[in-house]
């Protein structure tokens, strides 16, 4: 909450006066960067009953949440921090409940051990447990003072009006020397692949594989990933899943920031080695350019459709 709206009840009431505007926090992981902030949604001025302007008051509310939080003695309220800390720890522990996601998480933790990329979006339970109301407040102030700030707006308001509203709302933002972001670590693949097997009480095994790529040709890597395992017409789907029935699912993804290609699949334990070998054969086929024209055209169509659909979502435009 804020000094003016110290709890959820008063904060919700204030947002209700803005025709149901909503504000939520964001915690994102972009490569080796953690991006935190707030996102607000509100109706356009053209649709308010009496032509009310909402950009300015919503921006002001964002400024309050960021710069005028409710505190006591120069620190956040202990009860709020302990409650949110418990929620964070529960969320971290809950990651294991989705075994598919957990296999992918463990892949990155092992494959990128010692690199910032291995850190979870939500952090780890041990670090979360050490948070106090004072340490969190101090960290927040330092974060605002030294981090790069980006403001993204999607709507009908003129750019100058948006700039004025945001600058007014953030006028008290503490700013110091901006911390330089380190270069993203690019690690060479080891000579010998590593294999890690973990046992869990599940009915369906998960096979996650990761490859460090040497090419910096991003468009080519996107196309190759789609042909390999990025669509329902891909080699993994049509061969490993459909033709050979070695996996319940099999797909690939490409992380541009780290130049890493990953495979996620669900397999029966008895089919583990066959599935692993077949996935390797399909990847080798892509590396050698062994695909049909219809496979390439299908991948290109997927790229075009994805680009054309960007304007359908404000979140995607961001």
PLM segments and residue spans:
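M16 family metallopeptidases and their MPP-like homologs
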Residues: 8-64, 68, 100-123, 148-154, ...
């Amino acid at each position: 909450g804020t000094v003016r709206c110290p709890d959820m009840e008063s904060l919700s009431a204030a947002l209700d006066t803005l025709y149901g505007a909503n504000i939520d926090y964001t915690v994102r992981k972009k490569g080796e960067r953690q991006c935190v902030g707030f996102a607000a949604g509100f109706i356009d001025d053209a649709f308010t009953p009496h032509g009310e302007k909402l950009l300015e008051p919503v921006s002001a509310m964002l400024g309050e949440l960021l710069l005028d939080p409710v505190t006591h003695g120069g620190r956040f309220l202990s009860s709020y921090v302990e409650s949110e800390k418990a929620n964070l720890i529960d969320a971290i522990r809950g990651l294991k409940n989705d075994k598919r996601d957990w296999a992918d998480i463990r892949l990155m933790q092992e494959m990128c051990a010692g690199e910032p990329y291995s850190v979870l979006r939500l952090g780890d339970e041990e670090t979360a447990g050490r948070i106090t109301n004072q340490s969190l407040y101090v960290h927040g102030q330092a974060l605002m003072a030294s981090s790069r700030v980006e403001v993204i707006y999607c709507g009908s308001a003129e750019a100058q009006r948006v700039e004025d509203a945001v600058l007014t709302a953030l006028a008290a933002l503490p700013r110091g020397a901006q911390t330089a972001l380190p270069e993203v670590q690019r690690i060479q693949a080891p000579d010998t692949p590593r294999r890690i097997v973990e046992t869990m009480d599940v009915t369906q095994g998960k096979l996650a594989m990761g490859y460090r790529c040497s090419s910096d040709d991003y468009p080519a890597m996107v196309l190759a990933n789609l042909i390999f395992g990025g669509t329902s017409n891909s080699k993994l789907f049509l061969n490993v899943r459909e033709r050979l029935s070695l996996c319940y699912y099999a797909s690939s993804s490409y992380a541009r920031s780290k130049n890493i290609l990953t495979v996620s699949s669900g397999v029966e334990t008895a089919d583990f080695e066959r599935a692993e070998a077949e996935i390797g054969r399909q990847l080798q086929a892509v590396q050698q350019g062994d695909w049909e024209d219809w496979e390439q055209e299908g991948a290109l169509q997927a790229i075009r459709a994805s680009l054309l659909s960007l304007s359908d979502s404000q979140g995607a435009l961001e």
